[in-house]
């Protein structure tokens, strides 16, 4: 499985960007994406940017990665805040709801 890590751009140079998160700072190859700007978020795999992310998507990916760490650490209590919607019933998308038979009146 490949897991991309969201990193924030701190400084830019041709073909690379200095990026960081709570685990440190490192140079990332940016030749596969449009040139980023300081403050942008990059999805990084093997020290190469694969995608420029908006802040919301970067936050969701970071939360999912924290959830994986909590599971690996055996801390199920930490999952409640990371997956607050687990107690709701899943909803089918509209195109699949349209294929369901009509509900019988009760």
Curated annotation (Swiss-Prot):
It comes from the Bacteria. Gene3D superfamilies: 2.30.30.140. GO terms for biological process: protein maturation. GO terms for molecular function: carbon dioxide binding; iron ion binding. InterPro entries: Hydgase_assmbl_chp_CS, Hydrogenase_HupF/HypC. Belongs to the HupF/HypC family. NCBIfam families: hypC_hupF (TIGR00074). This is Hydrogenase expression/formation protein HoxL. It comes from Azotobacter vinelandii. The gene is hoxL.
